[in-house]
Amino acid sequence: MSKSPVAIIILDGFGKRAETVGNAVAQANKPNFDRYWADFPHGELKAAGLDVGLPEGQMGNSEVGHTNIGAGRIVYQSLTRIDKAIEEGEFQENKALNNAFTHTKENNSDLHLFGLLSDGGVHSHINHLVALLETAKDKGVKNVYIHAFLDGRDVAPQSSLEYLETLQKAMNDLNYGEIATVSGRFYAMDRDKRWERVEKAYKAIVSAEGEKFEDPIELVKASYANDKNDEFVVPAIITKDGKPVATVKDNDAVIFFNFRPDRAIQLSNAFTDKEWDHFDRGANHPKNIKFVTMTLYNPSVDAEVAFEPIEMKNVIGEVLSNEGLSQLRIAETEKYPHVTFFMNGGRNEEFPGENRILINSPKVETYDLQPEMSAYEVTDALVEDIKNDKHDAIILNFANPDMVGHSGMLEPTIKAIEAVDENLGRVVDLILEKGGSAIIFADHGNSETMSTPEGKPHTAHTTVPVPVIVTKKGVKLREGGRLADVAPTMLDLLGVKKPAEMTGESLIQK
């Protein structure tokens, strides 16, 4: 039977900004997007800060964006939740955190804090690290060591010195805590199974393998001199009196303070997996450690969780399933968890009638080397699916504007957007031919801002609104929309009643 599918099409990191300088979105040749913008109802959506359950002024990100999109409501994000717990004193009494503290006291062992050292608020926040230091000291933990992962991606590429100084000041004020290792997130936070990267971070933390420095600041400066920005700092060891400050040993406790799971899973697995074959963990692999993660990273990570997920009922996938509608989720590796796990409110399993297609992302060092990524392959698979009348609803993500946008390089990002536009045309024209419709929009900004006002590369997400197009003639879109309104709009286009849990509203004016 012929289907007229309704699609959610996410152009990841494709923000809306009037200024064209350093704006890959504005500079790209994108005839298909421009044609849909001219022909169909369009507007903009808020995709940052309070509108997606983040603190005011906080840039949006893919995890948060897809969670809000799928939920059809504003979802209180981990960052906001943990901030609130610290403010209200719940953090200090958190069971999992206190279990880690107790473990070190019972075993006369050390506490190690792993995580991304920045205030980017995408994966972690430095304030949470400072709160952990204060709490551990308050609870009588003797020694605490920090294994700092440098950012340079959700914040400026060379900003780690200020975060190291902030951390140093907090430790000086408390007279407590030391930095033991430093590693760029490229190594410690890989998510693409490039185990040789994770191995470097792991071996620095466990076996003190790597270059040695007495001062983290010197380490970073040496890395800059070597043309390696924060993200790419090779895992290195901090020493005192010629010896490593600390390694993770038998009976120690670890708290991984990243709250976003995807880039914390692999390193956590390296510490917690009983069965392991990705690299040789060596004789120093620590036994009997208490491993605590800030949020639930993945069922594969054997750890206690400080902030368990809040279960969400009636997300888009569940509603479609309950209505007996078939649905497809499709993306390449980099954004596959977003259209599945995050879109389903933190649930790994498919709903009945939900199918998934994963297309592998290209194995290149950085995506500016292959700006088209796997957009053509994703589209080939989807076109085939639509032609065969497989699904009533489609959720598609094009990763390129975000993933290439993170390089801070304008030209490759323009190419990325042009590749996406070509494929967007193939998908949307086919959907229209089938009598279906698409909601085309972004989950957050990035590629519209490729340079800072000083002309330096800008690699982070932004707080700008994102464009939205609904490819249906004869309707009007209301103003003031946000990401939480996308799922209700999809249901509206499908003629399905919105459940009470979805507090977002359809963008289509009644």
Swiss-Prot record:
Active site: 62
EC category name: isomerase
SS bond partners: none
Residues binding Mn(2+) 2: 12, 62, 443-444
Domain of life per record: Bacteria
Co-factor binding comment: Binds 2 manganese ions per subunit.
Amino-acid positions noted as binding substrate in the UniProt annotation, renumbered to this chain: 123, 153-154, 185, 191, 260-263, 335
Any one Gene Ontology molecular-function term assigned to this protein's record: manganese ion binding
Catalyses which reaction(s): (2R)-2-phosphoglycerate = (2R)-3-phosphoglycerate
Entry keyword set: Glycolysis, Isomerase, Manganese, Metal-binding
Stored CDD domains: iPGM
GO biological process: glucose catabolic process; glycolytic process
NCBIfam families: pgm_bpd_ind
Family: Belongs to the BPG-independent phosphoglycerate mutase family.
Summary of subunit composition and partner proteins: Monomer.
Protein name: 2,3-bisphosphoglycerate-independent phosphoglycerate mutase
